[in-house]
């Protein structure tokens, strides 16, 4: 997939047909319903389920042949679809929210509650832990660990901003924030809760708000920065 810049993403959202996807369980004389071809149905004579856009489904539900229905909906006028997770050779746990037009490398891991926005990239073997947020166009290299609750700032608006870049073999602790335009160098470690406002040199450890260098990675026990390959096996 070609890399998206901010203007590509803005154009995609602006020009997309906004949709309100719904799933409806319906009961009634279903054979009498006039259902347009763009609404997907699985009907028996008197019960069934429909999938479609609310603009197309709502008129059907007003038909007198419908006795009752139960509607499920999780978005309104959405501009970017959710990605087809089956296309990735990665481990993606239930509850991860991943929008379309992202890249996820082989053997990557995306944990429950993680949010991956349009244009983001995750390198092979990297883990995005629970509740982490990768904003639009955020780039994570190979064999990284992005800790639970961490935010890599998105850069769709303003469009001139440069994306966050996390180079290979980086470990970021829980609840850190990396601001737009920041590059975290190869093999670096970012402490939990840090707010990273400036580039981080390779193989250094930064902590605090704002994050500052406290030592080199060579001074840290290997057990505290180990990336476990077994967690990435499929």
From Swiss-Prot:
Give the keywords, sorted: Acyltransferase, Amino-acid biosynthesis, Diaminopimelate biosynthesis, Lysine biosynthesis, Repeat, Transferase
What sort of enzyme, by top EC class, is this? transferase
The protein's matches in SUPFAM superfamilies, at most eight in alphabetical order, are given as: Trimeric LpxA-like enzymes
Its BP terms in the Gene Ontology are: diaminopimelate biosynthetic process; lysine biosynthetic process via diaminopimelate
One MF annotation (Gene Ontology) recorded for this entry: tetrahydrodipicolinate N-acetyltransferase activity
Tell me the protein family, please: Belongs to the transferase hexapeptide repeat family. DapH subfamily.
Q: State the protein's name.
A: 2,3,4,5-tetrahydropyridine-2,6-dicarboxylate N-acetyltransferase
């Amino acid at each position: 997939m070609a890399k998206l810049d901010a203007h590509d993403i803005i154009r995609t959202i602006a020009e997309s047909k906004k949709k309100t996807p719904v799933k409806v369980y319906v009961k009634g004389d279903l054979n009498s319903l006039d259902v347009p071809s763009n609404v997907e149905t699985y009907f028996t004579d008197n019960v069934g389920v429909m999938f479609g856009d609310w603009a197309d489904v709502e008129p059907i539900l007003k038909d007198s042949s419908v006795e009752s229905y139960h509607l499920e909906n999780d978005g309104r006028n959405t501009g970017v679809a959710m990605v087809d997770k089956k296309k990735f050779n990665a481990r993606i746990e239930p509850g991860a929210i991943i929008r379309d037009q992202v890249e996820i490398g082989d053997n990557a891991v995306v944990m429950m509650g993680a949010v991956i926005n349009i244009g983001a990239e995750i390198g092979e073997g990297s883990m995005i832990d629970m509740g982490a947020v990768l904003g639009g166009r955020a780039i994570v290299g190979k064999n990284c660990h992005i800790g639970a609750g961490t935010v890599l700032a998105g850069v769709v608006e303003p469009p001139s901003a440069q994306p966050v870049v996390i180079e290979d073999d980086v470990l970021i602790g829980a609840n850190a924030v990396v601001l737009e335009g920041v590059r975290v160098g190869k093999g670096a470690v970012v402490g939990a809760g840090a707010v990273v406002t400036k580039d981080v040199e390779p193989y250094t450890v930064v902590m605090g708000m704002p994050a500052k260098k406290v030592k080199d990675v060579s001074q840290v026990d290997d057990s505290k920065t180990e990336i476990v390959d077994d967690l990435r096996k499929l």
